[in-house]
């Protein structure tokens, strides 16, 4: 019973966070030609926790490592960390996805 209660409360929290964050990132994804379903990567990466930080040092909703964040245009230093800025980090994520699409040739799996 305790596991069900935990799962229910976590699900409710994710729904609340999705209602807060998805309306911000959906237009950014669309403007950059990124499939709307990619927003769910944020759920997997950070549980939609804007202050998430992994033991390895990845941070923010999209869980960028410092060097990767800088590579895709985010300012990351001792004074500023734009990995926590939802709009800027989402634009950086779009750049990351576009680079991956260029390397792979498509967002779709083609055996």
What do the predicted segments below correspond to?
Residues 2-12, 48-55, 63-109:
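Substrate-binding clefts and substrate-entry loops adjacent to catalytic sites
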Residues 38, 62-63:
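Glycine-rich active-site/cofactor-binding loop and its immediate structural neighborhood
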Residues 20-26, 46-54:
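Short, mixed-charge, low-aromatic patches
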Residues 19, 36-37, 78-81:
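Acidic-enriched, low-complexity/disordered segments with a strong bias for Aspartate over Glutamate
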Residues 1-33:
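An acidic, Gly/Ser/Thr/Pro-rich helix-cap/linker signature
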Residues 16, 23, 27, 39, ...:
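Solvent-exposed, polar/charged alpha-helical surfaces in well-ordered, non-transmembrane soluble domains
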Residues 34-51, 108-111:
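Short, functionally critical alpha-helical segments immediately adjacent to catalytic or ligand/cofactor-binding
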